[in-house]
Amino acid sequence: MAPKNNAKGGDKKGKGKDASEGDKGKGGGKGLKPATSINVRHILCEKFSKKEEALEKLRNGAKFDDVAREYSEDKARQGGSLGWKVRGSLNADFEKAAYELEPSTTANPKYVEVKTGFGYHIIMVEGRK
């Protein structure tokens, strides 16, 4: 199957990678320097259908923290912010996915989906150190 490319005339308007390049949901962590801690946000949904609704909002350009406030069942008031987390302090599957993400902003998030015993997570990273 050919890769998705929904670009409209190749207009990038000075932005980095966008959803039309198929990168937004993948994180693209290749070449990242090792980090001992990350500043992470997530949207936690118990139900698959609710997670899909949240993803659709993100794909349509909504800010990550706004979607977290509306859909997340954890840390919703903080826009999904978990703060700075060191290696070993998070669920193993969640942590593996989060540490592979490139940092991004809530206005133009790079995110990844993970299912854990807690439910469905949509994760983004704001910083690494």
From Swiss-Prot:
Residues 35-127 form the PpiC domain. PPIases accelerate the folding of proteins. It catalyzes the cis-trans isomerization of proline imidic peptide bonds in oligopeptides. It catalyses: [protein]-peptidylproline (omega=180) = [protein]-peptidylproline (omega=0). Residues 1-34 are annotated as: Disordered. Belongs to the PpiC/parvulin rotamase family. PIN4 subfamily. One of its GO terms (biological process) is rRNA processing. One of its GO terms (molecular function) is peptidyl-prolyl cis-trans isomerase activity. InterPro entries: PIN4 (IPR043323), PPIase_dom_sf (IPR046357), PPIase_PpiC (IPR000297). It comes from the Eukaryota. It is an enzyme of class 5 (isomerase). Its EC number is 5.2.1.8. It comes from Aspergillus fumigatus (strain ATCC MYA-4609 / CBS 101355 / FGSC A1100 / Af293) (Neosartorya fumigata). This is Peptidyl-prolyl cis-trans isomerase pin4. GO terms for cellular component: nucleus. PROSITE patterns: PPIC_PPIASE_2. SUPFAM superfamilies: FKBP-like. Keywords: Isomerase, Rotamase. The gene is pin4. The keyword Amino-acid biosynthesis does not apply. Residues 9-26 have a biased composition (Basic and acidic residues).
